[in-house]
C-alpha cells in the first residue's frame, strides 16, 4: 500500500498491551489497536499511557493502526 492512501490522525495512548501493542483513543473518539513503527522501535523511543501520538490507519481496516510519532508533552518538567 502506498503512503498516500494512509489516514494520519492524532490520539492519546490509553493502555499498554503485550508485544509492543497499544490501545489509542483517537481525537474523533474512536479507539484503535496499534503497534509501533520500525523507526520508533529501532531508536528505543518509549511510549507510555498518557502520551500523545500520531497514528497511521489503513482505509481498509480502521480498527488497527501504526504509531509513527510520539508528540512532545506540553509540560516542560518531564
From Swiss-Prot:
SMART domains: S1. One of its GO terms (cellular component) is cytosol. PROSITE patterns: S1_IF1_TYPE. Residues 1-72 form the S1-like domain. It is found in: Plastid, Chloroplast. GO terms for molecular function: ribosome binding; rRNA binding; translation initiation factor activity. Belongs to the IF-1 family. Component of the 30S ribosomal translation pre-initiation complex which assembles on the 30S ribosome in the order IF-2 and IF-3, IF-1 and N-formylmethionyl-tRNA(fMet); mRNA recruitment can occur at any time during PIC assembly. NCBIfam families: infA. This is Translation initiation factor IF-1, chloroplastic. It comes from Chara vulgaris (Common stonewort). The gene is infA.
